[in-house]
Amino acid sequence: MRLPDPYTNPEYPGLGFESVNLVDNDPMIRDELPNGKVKEVKISAQYWGINISYPELFPDEYAFLDSRLLEYKRTGDYLDVLLPQYEAFRVRGDTKSVTIPAGQKGSQIILNTNGTLTGQPKAGDLFKLSTHPKVYKITNFSSSGNVWNISLYPDLFITTTGSEKPVFNGILFRTKLMNGDSFGSTLNNNGTYSGISLSLRESL
């Protein structure tokens, strides 16, 4: 289910985030060797953490957010989160007509736009494949005609089959709420609610 925000519920403007922190978690063991080198060994897959703080909410805004979070906990679903700072809409067009060759893996992906896309992504933009929930960041971009070469972090979690389509806009992080067992707020003497924050972890 989608975490409510002003895009989904414009009648509740307070659901816009006061601050949001996207954290790159890349679990790794580092060992300092006698020759001065540092050996790195990955111990788990990379995942994104998201920390969200809300401004003071009016009672109807708080009640709506609280009910959505309780519904998430009741159903055991995922929370899909959109981060507005990444909604640049630099790439537009018909992504359904884009082809992604099969057999690709690693940290780069090649796609053929077939002339259906306008604009170009930039380093730091988000990227996703239509068939898998993992979110990537673009680290480099180059093109030759209709062929785009996109460098990604982290490495692709899947090997492409040729059925995937690229996603550049409206990218949702699929997450689990990590502080749901102690979620709370403070009712102020002016009738607003404060101290509301969410700690989320990408979950595939």
From Swiss-Prot:
Query: Would you tell me the Gene Ontology cellular component terms?
Result: virus tail; virus tail, baseplate
InterPro entries linked to this entry: DTP-pb9_A-dom_C, DTP-pb9_A-dom_N, DTP-pb9_B-dom
Localization in the cell = Virion
Domain of life (superkingdom): Viruses
List UniProt keywords, sorted A-Z.
Late protein, Viral tail protein, Virion
Major place of localization? virion
Q: Gene3D superfamilies attached here?
A: 2.40.30.290, 3.30.200.190
Q: Which residues form the signal peptide?
A: none
Role noted for this protein: Forms the simplified baseplate, together with the p132 collar protein, the baseplate tube protein p140 and baseplate hub protein pb3.
Record note on domains: Possesses OB-fold domains probably serving host adhesion properties.
Q: How does it assemble?
A: Homohexamer. Interacts with baseplate tube protein p140 and baseplate hub protein pb3.
Query: What is this protein identified as?
Result: Distal tail protein pb9
